[in-house]
UniProtKB/Swiss-Prot annotation:
Chain residues that bind Mg(2+): E836, D860
NCBIfam families in alphabetical order: PRK05878.1 (NF004531), pyru_phos_dikin (TIGR01828)
Residues modified to Phosphothreonine: T543
Family annotation (InterPro entries): ATP_grasp_subdomain_1 (IPR013815), PEP-util_enz_mobile_dom (IPR008279), PEP_util_AS (IPR018274), PEP_util_C (IPR000121), PEP_util_CS (IPR023151), Phosphohistidine_dom_sf (IPR036637), PPDK_AMP/ATP-bd (IPR002192), Pyruvate_phosphate_dikinase (IPR010121)
Protein name as annotated: Pyruvate, phosphate dikinase 1, chloroplastic
Length: 963
């Protein structure tokens, strides 16, 4: 079917760096003929674009059957990048073919990732089937036009189609020289399985006869039935299951297991059955006009951009600002032409471990969707090496070329048609956290990338995956292993079994941990996959939909577990004689593929030498310091182990909740007189001092920022029925029940988060601030006596006026003076405040006269700026996100336009009043990568986050520098 109109003979083009100097004259050597060519000349392919330097070995092609066959081995050494077409703003259709293209890898926003990389592969001389890309702007215009092709676009598409037809000497709808097409989507950001694909477009009752005459009946009718299935599902909205049902019945009737065992006559009959599905489902015939098929397929791909599953994937992954999807239309090449054909997907390195070894799968006599969709369980690449050694050797060489060119680990789709290799797609491969770090470190060692580039190769979320738990004792569950599948995404997961995506989401919303068990996953399952702790599938391979999506999210996944049978209707999982019901617990080891009965204990992971090396590079580049929020000595030790440069927030109230301390706290709350309160605080003093000593010891030589008591006092009271609370407090404190009730009523507030808390407690009860300050200074002096370098910083919370801060600073400094007199020596310390009330940000210059440092409490600052109660926001925030009123949860991702501007203003005003002012942030946003970037640009000195998010913040701070 496919052939080249002009045979190309071997040609070598040699260029020099002087090409772009002066007249740009260079020499070509073609079959011994020397010619001088200037930049104004056009190359033989009709292109104005020249390679920069190096050598290209083109290949000789000949016509053979329906495929393109290689007579001389292809090699591509140099890496030219084509200049974008002159009027890109108006151009909506871009063509590409081997050795030439109208696009390049830098045009992803316009051509989508797939289209840009196809153009790039073609331009560097790899064997890419000729095709065209319809731009993302055309998709945007289609949506604006009410889901109609914009004016003039169809004519541009037909012009591009003529390019494909001329290139290969075949025509759409011509039975004597049939051209079949693939129609694929491709957004600027990879979204696996989110968009729809149609293969073998152009077949009808007449064309299939012509194709059969050239390529054999079995191949022709196998291609036709696949097209009917895909076109019906993607374009016409007929469920794939209706076609699958016909196929399964046919295999059952013929007594065969695989599709490949069906004869040509069987497939002919199946084609007619598939046509009847159209009539039954839609009440109309299958559209036989190939150009109408093409138009409908393009519209279907554009429509898929706005499908529920695509919207959900973008929402989950916070993908915004894209124009739409591009459409890639290519000449078909076939992996289902017999035992010398096949299709595969590979990564140039292992995406799970990062090992420098090709990692992928191959199916003999199959089409690409069979591998990617997980419909058939494939074999590893050694199968291809055995059966097609020449094609395999060329594939290995192409992988090396692409890694050198893109300077990254690549995800590649390819097809072999009668021993001829075709490259169908390449993109930067998704990888696990472990894989990302090893690949980055190895590529620096190999000289492929600089350290600054390597830092950009690891996403902050990758480090989050590395900090996920593993099984505590894998040897302890060996007897409970009930099945084993493919280890598609590493890590460990424990949860209750559910069988549908909807159930996974529902159970997750109730606070349950679930394992989603499916025969195979589809893009419609992404919501449930995201909600699940792990994913287990009976079918599919290491590059199936489930595997790719799970790896991208860092979720444990076992695929192709053929020992299990999923009965979704009865909600049971069958493994031999074993039945596991919905809701029962299983565990999964995604690193080994083991499915384990019951709940297994999890343990935190250990940091690898590669990670330590990588993080040392990040630390050397970043300017922003990273501190940790830690409330106990154990937290402080973990923080330091993870690279924290100090404690940015130590919440003293968390020290009060121990069983031996809470009674004293409650006595203090019930106290009526200052003397009663002091008596209770005297009991708490040694506890606080001991905790501070442990934290100072753990953070020897690093600053420790301690926040004075912040929450409303009612949070320390027991929960439950009021009568029971009163009785319990009366027994604990020795206060009469009526007095307890009276005290509780006085503590009751309509809006406690804006009430009696923070510095208001210390101002009303100065003895509370005195006790905490004494505990800090006594602990600091004691540790200093033991040779520990202590750097205490005391932080006053919820300040809204300079007078509030001034009052508390006076109390603290008086206590310090007393303690230092008692101890006979001093300790250097600072007093500062949290900026969490908008008014404090607005008058930061006045606040800075009293404060030696600012720490933005972004949780409360966000709450008060938006007027959203964190405790109640769940009632409406999901609606706001769904309707696009907000793009992100402002309590997770900093609102840079509002809250962010307050932070910038306060920083500038504060430093204007006190140039030495130290400024940081200690809210949850300190661990959010996108927010960390903003804080660095705003000129903050540090961020503080939970101990286990410290590595993520360290990397995010470095990536701001190299962005």
């Amino acid at each position: 079917m496919l052939y080249i109109r002009k045979k190309m003979t071997s040609m070598i083009v040699k260029t020099t760096p002087e090409l772009f100097k002066g007249n740009g004259v260079f020499r070509t050597d073609h079959l011994g003929e020397n010619r001088m060519v200037s930049r104004s000349n056009r190359l033989g392919d009709g292109s104005n674009r020249f390679p920069r330097t190096g050598t290209i070995h083109c290949q000789r092609l000949s016509i053979a059957k329906t495929g393109l066959h290689r007579e001389t081995k292809a090699r591509a050494i140099l890496s030219p990048v084509s200049d974008p077409a002159a009027s890109i703003a108006q151009k909506r259709v871009f063509t590409f073919g081997k050795g030439r293209s109208e696009g390049n890898k830098g045009m992803k926003s316009l051509l989508g990732g797939k289209g840009a990389n196809l153009a790039e592969m073609a331009s560097i001389g790899l064997s890419v089937p000729p095709g065209l890309t319809i731009s993302t702007e055309a998709c945007q215009q289609y949506q604006i036009a009410g889901k109609k092709l914009p004016e003039g676009l169809w004519e541009e598409i037909l012009e591009g189609l003529s390019f494909i037809e001329r290139d290969i000497g075949a025509s759409l709808a011509d039975p004597s020289k049939p051209l079949l097409l693939s129609v694929r989507s491709g957004a600027a950001i990879s979204m696996p399985g989110m968009m729809d694909t149609v293969l073998n477009l152009g077949l009808n009752d007449q064309v299939v006869v012509g194709l059969a005459a050239k390529s054999g009946e079995r191949f022709a009718y196998d291609s036709f039935r696949r097209f009917l299935d895909m076109f019906g599902d993607v374009v016409m909205g007929i469920p794939h299951a209706k076609f699958e049902e016909k196929l399964e019945r046919m295999k059952e009737r013929k007594g065969v297991k695989n599709d490949t065992d069906l004869s040509a006559a069987d497939l002919k009959e199946l084609v007619e059955q598939y046509k009847s599905v159209y009539l039954e489902a839609k009440g109309q015939e299958f559209p036989s006009d190939p150009k109408k098929q093409l138009e409908l397929a393009i519209e279907a791909v554009f429509d898929s951009w706005d499908s529920p599953r695509a919207n959900k994937y973008r929402s989950i992954n916070q993908i915004t600002g894209l124009k739409g999807t591009a459409v890639n239309i290519q000449c078909m090449v076939f992996g289902n032409m017999g035992d010398t054909s096949g299709t595969g997907v590979l990564f140039t390195r292992n995406p799970s471990t990062g090992e420098k070894k090709l990692y992928g799968e191959f199916l003999v006599n199959a089409q690409g969707e069979d591998v990617v969709a997980g419909i058939r369980t494939p074999e590893d690449l050694d199968t291809m090496k055995r059966f097609m050694p020449e094609a395999y050797a060329e594939l290995v060489e192409n992988c090396n070329i692409l890694e050198r060119h893109y300077k990254d680990m690549m995800d590649i789709e390819f097809t072999v048609q009668e021993e001829r290799l075709w490259m169908l797609q390449c993109r930067a491969g998704k990888r696990t956290g472990k894989g990302a770090v090893k690949i980055a470190v190895d590529m620096v060692g190999e000289g492929l990338v600089e350290k600054s580039s390597a830092i950009k190769m690891v996403e902050p979320q990758h480090l989050d995956q590395l900090l996920h738990p593993q099984f505590h004792d894998p040897s302890g569950y060996r007897e409970k292993v009930v099945a084993k599948g493919l280890p598609a995404s590493p890590g460990a997961a424990v949860g209750q079994v559910v069988f549908t995506a909807e159930e996974a989401e529902a159970w997750h919303s109730q606070g349950k941990t679930v394992i989603l068990v499916r025969t195979e996953t589809s893009p419609d399952d992404v919501g449930g996959m995201h909600a699940a702790e792990g994913i287990l599938t009976a079918r599919g391979g290491m590059t199936s939909h489930a595997a790719v999506v799970a790896r991208g999210w860092g979720k444990c996944c076992i695929a192709g577990c053929s020992e299990i049978r999923v009965d979704e209707n009865h909600k049971v999982l069958l493994i031999g004689d074993l039945t596991i019901n919905e809701g029962e617990w299983i565990s999964m080891n995604g690193s080994t593929g083991e499915v384990i009965l019951g709940k297994q204990a999890l343990a935190p992971p250990a940091l690898s030498p590669d990670l330590e090396t990588f993080m040392s590079w990040a630390d050397a580049i970043r300017r922003l310091k990273v501190m940790a929020n830690a409330d106990t000595p154990e937290d402080a030790i973990a923080a330091r182990k993870n690279g924290a440069q100090g404690i940015g927030l130590c919440r003293t109230e968390h020290m009060f909740f121990g069983a031996d301390r809470i009674k004293a706290v409650r006595k203090m709350i019930m106290a009526v007189t200052t003397e009663q309160r002091k008596a209770s605080l005297d009991i708490l003093l040694p506890y606080q001092r001991s905790d501070f000593e442990g934290i100072f010891r753990a953070m020897d030589g690093l600053p420790v920022t301690i926040r004075l008591l912040d929450p409303p006092l009612h949070e320390f009271l027991p929960e439950g029925d009021l009568d029971n609370i009163v009785h319990e407090l009366a027994e604990e404190t020795g206060v009469k029940e009526d007095e307890v009730l009276s005290r509780i009523e006085k503590l009751s507030e309509v809006n406690p988060m804006l009430g009696f808390r923070g510095c208001r407690l210390g101002i009303s009860y100065p003895e509370l601030t005195e006790m905490q300050a004494r505990a800090i200074f006594e602990a600091a002096a004691s540790m200093q006596d033991q040779g520990v370098t202590v750097i205490p910083e005391i932080m006053v919370p919820l300040v809204g006026t300079p007078q509030e801060l001034g009052h508390q600073v006076d109390v603290i400094r008086k206590v310090a003076k007393k303690v230092f007199a008692e101890k006979g020596h001093t300790v250097s310390y600072k007093v500062g405040t949290m900026i969490e009330i908008p008014r404090a940000a607005l008058i930061a210059d006045e606040i800075a006269k009293e404060a030696e440092f600012f720490s933005f409490g972004t949780n409360d600052l966000t709450q008060m700026t938006f007027g959203y109660s964190r405790d109640d926001v769940g009632k409406f925030l999901p609606i706001y996100l769904a309707k696009g009123i907000l793009q992100h949860d402002p309590f997770e991702v900093l609102d840079q336009q509002g809250v962010g501007q307050l932070i910038k203003m306060a920083t500038e005003k504060g430093r204007a009043a006190r140039p030495s002012l130290k400024v940081g942030i200690c809210g949850e946003h300190g661990g959010d990568p996108s927010s960390v970037g903003f804080f660095a640009e705003a000129g903050l000195d540090y961020v503080s986050c939970s101990p286990f998010r410290v590595p993520i913040a360290r990397l995010a701070a470095a990536q701001v520098v190299v962005a």
